[in-house]
C-alpha cells in the first residue's frame, strides 16, 4: 500500500481514498491482546467505549451484522483493501469514521505514516469484543500470527522516541500537503492529545519521553546534571546527601522543590544579615535569566507558569518566615521585654537620631531592645523604615534638628509617667504584638523627647496623634 494516501479521516472523508483509514484502527477496538501494551492505552479505552456505542447500536444485530447497509460503507475500496476470506467481512457497517478518527490522528502524528502494515486485517476487528465471534477459528489464528508479526514491526514506529532514526526515516513518507501541526489539525473530541502519548511512553522511558516531546534530549540531561551539581552547594547543611540526577519525570521537580525550601530555610538564618540571599530566589524564580540552571528551556512545564507560581510561593513563604521570626523573637524576649520596651520607646530610632544624652542605661537597652532586631533583619525592613522616615519628615520631624535647644534631656518625672502609661497599656493588651509595637512607638519617640511641654499637655497636636496611634495598636 502506498503511504502517501494515508490521510486522517476528517480531512477528506468524502473521497474513496479515506476508506483506507478504517484499517488504521486494525485490531485495537476489541482485541485485548498483549500486543497493545505500551501503545495507545488511553485511546484503546476510549475506542472500546465508542465501539459499544457504534457497533452495538440499533444497526447491529446478531443476525444481520455482517452485511448491514450503512452510509459509511465503501464496498469497492474495502474489497480492494483486503482480499480473500475477508472480502465479505470488510463492510464494517457501523460508522468507522467517528470511531477511527482518534487512531488516524494518533498514528499520523506519533508513528509517522504507519498505514502500510495495517491494511491486512481489514476492518472486521470491530466485531470482536462486542459478542460477535462469528469468524472461523482459522481466521482468528491467522490474525493472531499477524498480530505477533506486527508487534515486531511496530516497535520502532510506535515509539519514535526510542528509535529516532526510524522516526526520521518515516517522516518523509507523510504527504507533503498534509498539515501536521496543532494549528492546522485542531484536535477533535475523540482525538487524544499528544500529551497522552507522552505520558504513556514516559512510564517506560522518561528520557525517551522527554526526547520525544523536545528535540534536544541532551539539553535536558545537561540541565539535570547542572541542577544536581548546583543544588547541593546551596542546601548542603540542610539535606544530608545530594540528590542524584533525575531519573523520573517528577524527580527533577521534587529536586527543585527541595532546593526551594532549602534556600528559604537557609535564608532564615542568613538573609537577615545579607539581603541578597532573600532576593536571590525571587530573581531566579522570575525566569528572566534563561541561563540559570533551574529554568532552562527544556523544562516540561513552561517557564512562565513555573515562575509565576514560584514567585507567589516565595513571596508568601517569605512573609511566613518573617512572621515566624517575629513570633519566636517575641517569645524569646518575653521575660525582659517590658523593661526593654520602655527603653525602646524612650530612645530614638537609630544612633544617628536626635543627639540627646542617654539616661538610666538606655544605651544598654538600645543594644538589647531595638538595635538587635534591626541588625538581624538587615535590609528586609529597610524600605518600610525609609517610608516611615519620609512620612515623619513630611510631618515636620527633623532627623538633625538645627535648634539644639529643643532637644532637652528627659527628667525623672517624665520617665515615671512614661513607665506608668506603658504599664497601663500593657495591661490593656497593648504589648501583645510586642516587637512591632515597640518599633512603631519608637518612631514617635523623638516628639516625646524633644517636646517636653507637649508631652505633659494632652491637648496638643503631637500628643493627640500619639495617643491615637496607641489606640490604633490596641
Curated annotation (Swiss-Prot):
Cell compartment(s), UniProt: Nucleus
Swiss-Prot/TrEMBL keywords: DNA-binding, Nucleus, Phosphoprotein, Transcription, Transcription regulation
One record GO biological process: positive regulation of DNA-templated transcription
Biased composition (Polar residues): 262-277
Basic and acidic residues composition-biased segments: 26-38, 136-154, 317-346, 356-365
Positions of post-translational Phosphoserine modification: 49, 76, 202, 292, 382
Phosphothreonine: residues bearing it: 301
InterPro entries: Vasculin_fam
Region: Disordered, residue numbers: 17-42, 91-191, 238-371, 453-474
Coiled-coil regions, chain positions: none
UniProt name for this protein: Vasculin-like protein 1
Higher taxonomy: Eukaryota, Metazoa, Chordata, Craniata, Vertebrata
The encoding gene: GPBP1L1
Amino acid at each position: 500500500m502506498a503511504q502517501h494516501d494515508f490521510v486522517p479521516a476528517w480531512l477528506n472523508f468524502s473521497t474513496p481514498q479515506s476508506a483506507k483509514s478504517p484499517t488504521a484502527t486494525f485490531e485495537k477496538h476489541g482485541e485485548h491482546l498483549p500486543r497493545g501494551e505500551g501503545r495507545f492505552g488511553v485511546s484503546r479505552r476510549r475506542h472500546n467505549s465508542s465501539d459499544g456505542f457504534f457497533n452495538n447500536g440499533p444497526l447491529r444485530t446478531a443476525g444481520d451484522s455482517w452485511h448491514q447497509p450503512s452510509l459509511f460503507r465503501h464496498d469497492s475500496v474495502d474489497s480492494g483493501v483486503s482480499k480473500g476470506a475477508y472480502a465479505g467481512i470488510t463492510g464494517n457497517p457501523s460508522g468507522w469514521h467517528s470511531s477511527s478518527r482518534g487512531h488516524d490522528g494518533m498514528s499520523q502524528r506519533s508513528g509517522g505514516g504507519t498505514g502500510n502494515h495495517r491494511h491486512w486485517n481489514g476492518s472486521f476487528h470491530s466485531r470482536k469484543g462486542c459478542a460477535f465471534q462469528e469468524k472461523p477459528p482459522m481466521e482468528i489464528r491467522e490474525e493472531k500470527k499477524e498480530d505477533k508479526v506486527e508487534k515486531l514491526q511496530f516497535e520502532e514506529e510506535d515509539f519514535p522516541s526510542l528509535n529516532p532514526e526510524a522516526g526520521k526515516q518515516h517522516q518523509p513518507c507523510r504527504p507533503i500537503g498534509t498539515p501536521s501541526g496543532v494549528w492546522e489539525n485542531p484536535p477533535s473530541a475523540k482525538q487524544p492529545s499528544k500529551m497522552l502519548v507522552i505520558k504513556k511512553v514516559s512510564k517506560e522511558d522518561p528520557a525517551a519521553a522527554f526526547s520525544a516531546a523536545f528535540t534536544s534530549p541532551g539539553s535536558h540531561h545537561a540541565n539535570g546534571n547542572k541542577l544536581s551539581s548546583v543544588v547541593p552547594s546551596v542546601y548542603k547543611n540542610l539535606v544530608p546527601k545530594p540528590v542524584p540526577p533525575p531519573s523520573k519525570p517528577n524527580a527533577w521537580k521534587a529536586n527543585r522543590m527541595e532546593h526551594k525550601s532549602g534556600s528559604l530555610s537557609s535564608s532564615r538564618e542568613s538573609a537577615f544579615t545579607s539581603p541578597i540571599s532573600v532576593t536571590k530566589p525571587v530573581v531566579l524564580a522570575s525566569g528572566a535569566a534563561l541561563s540559570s540552571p533551574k529554568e532552562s528551556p527544556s523544562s516540561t512545564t513552561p517557564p512562565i507558569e513555573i515562575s509565576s507560581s514560584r514567585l507567589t510561593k516565595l513571596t508568601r513563604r517569605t512573609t511566613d518566615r518573617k512572621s515566624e521570626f517575629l513570633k519566636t523573637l517575641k517569645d524569646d524576649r518575653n521575660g525582659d521585654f517590658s523593661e526593654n520596651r520602655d527603653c525602646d520607646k524612650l530612645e530614638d530610632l537609630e544612633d544617628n537620631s536626635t543627639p540627646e544624652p542617654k539616661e538610666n542605661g538606655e544605651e544598654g537597652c538600645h543594644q538589647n531592645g531595638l538595635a538587635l532586631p534591626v541588625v538581624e533583619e538587615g535590609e528586609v525592613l529597610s524600605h518600610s523604615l525609609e517610608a516611615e522616615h519620609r512620612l515623619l519628615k513630611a510631618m515636620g520631624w527633623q532627623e538633625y534638628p538645627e535648634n539644639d535647644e529643643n532637644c532637652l534631656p528627659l527628667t525623672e518625672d517624665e520617665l515615671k509617667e512614661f513607665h506608668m502609661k506603658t504599664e497601663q497599656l500593657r495591661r490593656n493588651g497593648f504589648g501583645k504584638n510586642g516587637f512591632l509595637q515597640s518599633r512603631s512607638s519608637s518612631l514617635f519617640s523623638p516628639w516625646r523627647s524633644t517636646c517636653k511641654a507637649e508631652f505633659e499637655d494632652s491637648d496638643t497636636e503631637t500628643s493627640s496623634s500619639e495617643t491615637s496611634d496607641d489606640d490604633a495598636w490596641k
